[in-house]
Structure formats: C-alpha cells, structure tokens
C-alpha cells in the first residue's frame, strides 16, 4: 500500500463507502491519482474504459477458480452486472460487458472540481477527447483513429456518435426480425446531410457475439434505411494502407476532401495502433 497526500478539498463524491467497512476512491479520483504516472494516451484509454460499456479484466487462475466456486455455492448470486464476452477460440475471455462506471456529466463535474489543481488542467484537456459509451476496446481504437485531431494521430472527423439506436422501418425489420439496431460508429458530414455507419467486426472481441443479428442482415437493414455502411476489422485498422483506403472511402461518402498526413501526424497515428 502506498500512501498519497491529497492537499485541499477533495472533489465531490470522490470517496465511496463499502459494505465491508472501509472507504475506496471513486473511479475518477483513482484515474486522477494515476494520471501523474501515465502518458496522455494512456490516461485517455483509462478514461475511455471507465466511460465505456466494457472492462478488460484478466483474472488470475486462483481468483477465477474462487469466483466459480462462490457462484456455484450460492455465496454470490451473480457477477453484479458483469457479463463475460465469449471468445472465438474457446479460451476464457478477459473482456466483460458492464454498465458505464462514469457518465459524461460525472466527468464534467469532476473536471470542474480539479480545475486549477496540480495535473488538473491536463486531466481536463484529456477528458475532452474521451469517447462516451464505447462497447469494446475495438470501438475505442476505431473512434480515436477516426475522431482525434490529426495532430494527435486521428483523422479529424467531427461529431462521431457511438452505439446509435436506429428504429427500423417495416421493410428493414423484415430483414433482421427486430424493431431497432445499433450503429457502432456514426459519422456525419458538417452539414448533416450525409452519414456513414461503421460496423466494427470481430464480435467476440468486439463484445456483442450474442446479439442475434448476422452482420449481413444488419448491414442490409441499415442500407434499407438509407445509410452508407462500411465494415471495419482489426486487420484493416492495424494496416496503414488498408486503413488509409477506408478513410478515403469515408471521405468520398461524406463528400469531404482527403488530405495526406504530415510525417509528424503519421508518427502520432502509429502510437494509436
């Protein structure tokens, strides 16, 4: 245990009581304390996970066994809202689904409380870049590569929305058998007249392997609703040339001009992968 001295008034709701008789720091205060040891990019990923609908948690073998015993014996009835995502290779997954630990308004309030503190302005600046409600690490990576300013390695697409609910028309419902679907990432042109839906593929790692919709069905249903749809894979964002082709396709769909990156911007992009 390392002791930390926090001078001044603590941010609101930054210390939480537990039923076990001890106090814990809130997720945001924990991230703030950690931030002095993290790069801006590392802090951004930490906050994105806290504000997302997923967690990456690889349990040690002993703890995994203890958790199974506790559930089987009835000592705990559930994993308290955490659901492990299936993996394609049958190995126990370290990716979990859960509700967001931090909402956008929580992040805004915390930033207003730490503004002016040491590391506070940096924390606030990084928080402005955090995607809210991402469903997987893949969505976070795709969002950052597409949405961050070009100086930080992204493509500078503005106003990207995550997990947008789309209510389907009668004809689109007939394709998927559902009344609505979710778009992983929705990009819009500055005038709002053109939109591109990006579907993140690789559902086991993406976090929605059991959503009951085949990729082709969802893509066809969204196209029936008038959306341009692109499928995005890990392989595509990992390969610079493949990803560049995707970006150029998005620019064409949004009627936006593509501009080659400078050497500094390319180096910043490499850090995001």
List the model feature ranges, each with a label:
Residues 70-76, 80-273:
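Surface segments flanking catalytic/ligand-binding clefts of nucleic-acid enzymes
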